[in-house]
């Protein structure tokens, strides 16, 4: 009898971690709260941000803005916002002056509950406006010195972009998202169009890890179909 009981206990202790590991996580968003985002060269213009808290198993993990993009039935991406302390050194003993800032993008795994930051090449948190399709992100990237503009298509899981095409000099004003509109996607076939200004319209065909430019005749044939 003792041997039987020991066997049952051993099996229980062996199986228990497996059940604990497979317990599903609950991913949820909080209510929308409107906060002020100070922009411009002097940070004297206030824009509204509609912020939501991101919870994993009722625990606050991040703050987000905008709608999430469903990549798969398991993964989604969403943009991060955060608060930074704007206090000066001589004000360190005072109450922190929290200022909201817009950040990069997060990838959330519903099964593991893991939240990870996405590295998007040439992505500028102030000027770049990404457009998501499947596991691709298309946006206008900005060089590190802020002088050059690029058409960029990045794919989740890849360090290098599958497209990086120079678009000329950066010409955005002091407002966020002013470099160029979000690119437009279409499917069957998968294509993305960049229009950084009235004089430029570039369409690219996306096939896996490869991107090809679409000429005018191909675009006309696709429209006719």
Residue ranges and their predicted role:
Residues 2-10, 14:
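Sec-dependent signal peptide recognition
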Residues 18-22:
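Boundary at the C-terminal end of the N-terminal hydrophobic targeting segment
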Residues 27-61, 99-120, 150-169, 202-222:
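Surface-exposed loop/turn elements that mediate protein-protein interactions on large endomembrane-trafficking
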Residues 53-129:
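Surface-exposed acidic loop/strand-edge motifs in secreted or periplasmic proteins
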Residues 65-72, 128-136, 177-192:
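Blade-terminus and WD-like Trp-Asp/Gly-His loop motifs, strongest in beta-propeller folds
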Residues 79-82, 96-99, 138-145, 193-199:
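Beta-strand C-termini and the immediately following turn/loop, strongest in propeller blades
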Residues 121-127, 167-175:
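Short coil/turn segments at the loop-to-beta-strand junctions that recur within blades
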Residues 179-225:
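Hydrophilic extracytoplasmic domains
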């Amino acid at each position: 009898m003792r041997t039987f009981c020991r066997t049952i206990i051993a099996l229980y202790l062996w199986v228990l971690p497996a059940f604990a590991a497979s317990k599903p996580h609950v991913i949820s968003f909080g209510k929308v709260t409107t906060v002020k985002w100070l922009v411009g060269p002097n940070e004297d213009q206030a824009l509204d941000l509609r912020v939501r808290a991101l919870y994993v198993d009722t625990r606050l993990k991040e703050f987000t803005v905008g709608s999430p993009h469903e990549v798969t039935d398991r993964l989604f991406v969403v943009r991060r916002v955060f608060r930074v302390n704007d206090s000066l050194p001589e004000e360190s003993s005072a109450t922190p002056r929290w200022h909201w800032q817009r950040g990069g993008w997060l990838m959330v795994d519903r099964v593991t509950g893991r939240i990870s930051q996405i590295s998007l090449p040439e992505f500028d948190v102030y000027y770049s406006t990404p457009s998501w399709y499947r596991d691709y992100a298309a946006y206008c990237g900005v060089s590190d010195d802020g002088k050059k503009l690029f058409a960029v298509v990045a794919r989740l899981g890849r360090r290098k972009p599958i497209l990086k095409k120079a678009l000329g000099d950066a010409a955005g004003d002091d407002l966020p998202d002013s470099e160029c509109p979000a690119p437009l996607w279409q499917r069957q076939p998968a294509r993305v169009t960049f229009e950084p200004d009235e004089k430029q319209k570039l369409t690219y065909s996306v096939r896996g890890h490869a991107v090809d430019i679409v000429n005018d005749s191909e675009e006309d044939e696709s429209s006719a179909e």
